[in-house]
């Protein structure tokens, strides 16, 4: 029962294995880094001892100090390689763990999408959209029916018929005023006076048959000159 609720112990251990490996690798790299610093200090100390013994003329002790320095240097090189290997392994595990977590997240997302789409397909979506369109159209028809006036006969009156009836009433009103005692009879409209061109009293000069008729040329020239003068006056010339 407990394994059903909380999962089996092996599954939990497998899940914690990458984190545990990363933690142990980091701790071991820190330990080796401290060892590197210690060996570097020992190498510096032995080199100073060799210089001291050499200054005192004790070559054997100076040589022994240099040998110890070489031993420390050899150990330091080995530890450097170990640190490099551990760091590469650490980076690989971290990258693999990151990929694993990414895949888990993607898998959960795919499962969620699958669960969402279980009750959906193209046919059902089309049916639902058709139902929505039908309801929208029905709503528009209902709105149009509600906004329609109750007494439609008022809106069906012919406007031309109203205008004719109005004209008849106006004529009747004019006739009634004329028939009243003492009403002034409307005077007829004065005739429009039409001005005709004057006929010259003297005879028109006869033109020779060989010469072109110049009737109206002088008048046209006068009009052109008058138009030219008006234009000059407008331009201030």
Swiss-Prot record:
Pfam family, one: Snf7
Coiled coil: 67-141
Location of the region described as Disordered in the Swiss-Prot/TrEMBL record: 187-237
Record's keyword annotation contains Metal-binding: no
Cellular component terms per the entry's GO annotation: cytoplasmic side of plasma membrane; cytosol; ESCRT III complex; multivesicular body
InterPro entries the record matches: Snf7_fam
GO MF: identical protein binding
Biased composition (Polar residues): 198-209
Subcellular location(s) per record: Cytoplasm; Endosome membrane
Topology within the bilayer: Peripheral membrane protein
Keywords in alphabetical order: Coiled coil, Cytoplasm, Endosome, Membrane
Biased composition (Basic and acidic residues): 226-237
GO BP terms: ATP export; intralumenal vesicle formation; late endosome to vacuole transport via multivesicular body sorting pathway; peroxisome organization; protein transport to vacuole involved in ubiquitin-dependent protein catabolic process via the multivesicular body sorting pathway; reticulophagy; vesicle budding from membrane
Task performed by this protein: Required for the sorting and concentration of proteins resulting in the entry of these proteins into the invaginating vesicles of the multivesicular body (MVB). Also required for the proteolytic cleavage of the transcription factor RIM101 in response to alkaline ambient pH.
Family as reported in the entry's similarity comment: Belongs to the SNF7 family.
Subunit and interaction comment: A component of the endosomal sorting required for transport complex III (ESCRT-III).
Name under which the protein is recorded: Vacuolar-sorting protein SNF7
Organism: Eremothecium gossypii (strain ATCC 10895 / CBS 109.51 / FGSC 9923 / NRRL Y-1056)
Gene encoding the protein: SNF7
